[in-house]
Amino acid sequence: MLKFIKSIFKTPSDRIIANLKSKIQQVHSAESSLAKLSNIELRNKTNEFKARLANNEPIDNIQYEAFAVVREAAKRTIGIQHYDEQLIGGILLHQGKVIEMSTGEGKTLVATLPSYLNALIGKGVHVVTVNDYLAQRDSDWMGTIHRFLDITVGCITSNTNEHARKIAYNSDITYITNNELGFDFLRDNMQFTNQSKVQRGCNYAIIDEIDSILIDEARTPLIISGPVSDNTSLYPIINKLITKLNKDDYEMDEKLRNVTLTDSGINKLETMLAEINILAPNSNSLYDFENMHLIHYINQSLKAHTLFRRNVDYLVKNGKVIIIDEFTGRTMDSRRYSEGLHQALEAKEKVEIQNENQTLASITFQNYFRMYTKLSGMTGTAMTEATELKEIYDLDVVTVPTHNPVQRIDYNDEIYSTKKDKYSAIIQLIQECYSKGQPVLVGTVSIEKSEELSKLLHSKKIPHNVLNAKHHDKEASIIAQAGRIKAITIATNMAGRGTDIMLGGNAEMLVDQSNLTEEEYQEKLKITKMQIEQEKEQVINAGGLFVIGTERHESRRIDNQLRGRCGRQGDPGQTKFFLSLEDDLMRIFASDRVTKILRTIGLKDGEAIHHPLINRSLATAQQKIEAQNYEIRKNLLKYDNVMNDQRKVIYEQRNEAISSDNVNEILHNLTEELIVETVHKFIPPKSYKEDWNIHELLKEYHHIFNVKLQPASIEATSSSSEVIEYLTKTALDIYKQQEQDYSAKSANEAIKHIFIKTLDQTWKEHLYTLDHLKQGISLRAYGQKDPLNEYKREAFDLFKQMLLHLKYLFIQRVARLHIDLASSPKSTSSLLETSDNNLKGKIITENSMAHKYFGKISRNQLCPCNSGKKFKHCHGALK
């Protein structure tokens, strides 16, 4: 019935595809004449296209001809020709859409079409992948086509040095991971010269596995941080106390991933803290003001012990706690949990505790990728997230039909009462498949589960491979051979995604080329391919690849991705999920009513059940979790949008200063603004002269400009505007004197450097303040206030304060500028290094100036600059 209804009422994707099929003929028509061209003549088509675009011909006018050129080049270079469905995918990508193409349908090849076409403009194309292996593989493989057509290709991985990065970004097409792309953007906005930057803007990006990058990773912002000198000695002490608590001492909510102490837990901790003299003197309550800082350590340690599991949420490797990505199952070596949670985990695992970090720069993938002029992407599973992709990124999703009909069989779920029964059934099915030579891919949700299943297979003496975050270096080679006869592969979540599982195996990966001549390699490859073809027939006869899911994921999309690992390009395949009432999804999210019904039915040991009610309950649970995660991502975006608007202002000012040959305009404008604000503070406009606070005005002016003026000079004026004019002229005279002392060029370079350093310092402090504001803002809801509106309002006020503080510090530093030109024969620009250590002796640092001009001040006193901050966090900050 459903198929009949679908045949009558076409989906939006069906209508779009039907419209594009007629346009594919234009590609075929253009291609007929290209086959006769020599390689050089075909390559020259690139120059022809560039010339036509330079003459303002619309890019869409050359689209089909350009696609035909790429198709012909692919046939001549890698021996593969785009089929019609891939051409349709290429058109949709060029239109800035997300295409859903099944596994094995050649998404990598599809991307060559729009990437070539858009590279002709000369502004760069970024082909974004999820890991270094895929970026390098696609660059080498697909780059052959582009280089043949005289299009430059670059590749950036985590090991690429700065010089090579710049060359790669300046290439026509750059293959790169999403993390490298985002971090390079942040790093570029921390550089001191345009020459030090590596990127050249955001023109057009094609994102492979777009759902993984824009949906799964959207909750985790990219952060560049630096260590702060917080004391970490409390973490192991608190950790030891937390281990002495029992389950009655805290309440845990696994749905919300939250844990709180009960009264008994608080009482126990207060007693233990008092015994080891951690509580403040004359205090016996954890919630006394003097002890409030301990709550942070306790909460994080409690989370570490109750909500975070080793080999599920993180693993310990080489004495370090490394986060495991919950969606990909891969390790995130360069990332750390914030707010002391990572330190709590390090204390729990008894490894070296590293200092907490302070954010220096951050951005979410949501805001980063929205900077691109044009954005498109491809994946095997996007329709379940079509609403989010449209609402947040304004991207439409279109399903591209498969080249061959799908022959995969998806069996109903089997549900068992216990995990033990479930694993027994899985092992039995694996044994059956193994005995007839059918390859099996088993998907697990964590390292812990994959190793548990591996032990069971070892006990049955069934040979197998395990692919998880501990063995990620072998990922591509293991997954590529998962389609061989009797191959049993256990993989976490999305491990190996992006690498096709070929029935019979992958010949190129089986033949080691390192010790062979080209002739020997080709001969061995030919023999291996023949063997694989024979093996493929045996695998097909056995039923193709059998994919087993050991439990349902929180997201339906992840389940669909696992199913999609088999049945590529019309190959046969089978999938089945095995569940138990002890699975996290069933235990935490499935309704109590369903569990009660199953208990009432009374499942016997080893007995499975197929029940529509349970399937509906699971689907409902998954939809609820997906909706909850979507709300989290939307909420994160709302908060990040506040910071993003401020980030744009700061980065714009920074780039303007870096690009400027003369920063005098910035200096003079800020000086005039500050003097107006300062004068109006002590001499309000239209006020009587006897109300003027001349003494405090001159005291403030001295703090800023290091110039002592006599009261008579102000008393001689008749209005606040005259005072402003006089004080502004005095300040500008200081700057003129600096130009005479050091030359205009030297002074300009020094002032530019001071502005950028001061901007970076105040922005870093502002990010720190915003982090703390965000942590506690949700509590405003208890006061009947909208936390988001409160955050927007306070963040804006803080931003205004930051800009005022920036102005004050910058002008104060410039007024005290001293360049020691005699210390080195180098140019002034070479004297102005980015590090504070190199800065000392060249430009007087803020810390030394603060003590010189403010006198002896306690570090905990308010700073005399009127910023409202403590002296130690302002002019007395340690450099």
UniProtKB/Swiss-Prot annotation:
Bilayer disposition of the protein: Peripheral membrane protein
Catalytic class of the enzyme: translocase
The UniProt record lists the keyword Iron-sulfur: no
CDD domains: DEXDc_SecA, SF2_C_secA
Subcellular location: Cell inner membrane; Cytoplasm
Cofactor-binding details, from the entry: May bind 1 zinc ion per subunit.
Binding site for Zn(2+): 863, 865, 874-875
Gene Ontology MF annotations: ATP binding; metal ion binding; protein-exporting ATPase activity
One annotated GO biological process: protein targeting
Cell division in keyword set: no
Role according to the record: Part of the Sec protein translocase complex. Interacts with the SecYEG preprotein conducting channel. Has a central role in coupling the hydrolysis of ATP to the transfer of proteins into and across the cell membrane, serving both as a receptor for the preprotein-SecB complex and as an ATP-driven molecular motor driving the stepwise translocation of polypeptide chains across the membrane.
Assembly mode: Monomer and homodimer. Part of the essential Sec protein translocation apparatus which comprises SecA, SecYEG and auxiliary proteins SecDF-YajC and YidC.
Protein name stated in the entry: Protein translocase subunit SecA
Organism: Orientia tsutsugamushi (strain Ikeda)
Phylogenetic lineage: Bacteria, Pseudomonadati, Pseudomonadota, Alphaproteobacteria, Rickettsiales
